[in-house]
């Protein structure tokens, strides 16, 4: 592949900002659209393979409603104190929008005690705060949290759909490529869309 290298990560530059730009999982998207149209977002739990768009979908939802947003990556902040203190401080303050949304990314990294604290926070602040959790392994999320969420499995799009998204990115970045390049990247990365785009960017040379 030949193009111009840059510091900006393509996965961020081309992260969909709306539901219309999101690929795959049409049945989930239709339900999410109803939540947004009604202006009433439940607690949500998205689970599935890494790189298939769980975090992207969570951020689209948060940005599509009248809400303040707090984002926490639970792989970095997974202790009971981090969850309880940070979220409680955020949820208990007066907001200027209808909702407060907490995205807990990689929630399966939360310790059992942290999950127990989270369950209590979900109950205490349910009038004003909605929680959107993402994880790879839903079985690591305690049942009391799962029961408080609308839970959706996020499945990877077909290889052809991922390949077309990669082609769109390369065309937008004016990168010359061979079809064999696309096939090789998809075969080594699928079903991880994020990995495919990162791999393509890493192969671009000056």
Question: Each predicted region: which residue ranges?
Answer:
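P-loop/Walker A NTP-binding region and its immediately flanking N-terminal helices
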Residues: 1-152, 160-171, 179-187, 195-202
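Loop-to-helix "switch" segment enriched in basic
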Residues: 205-206
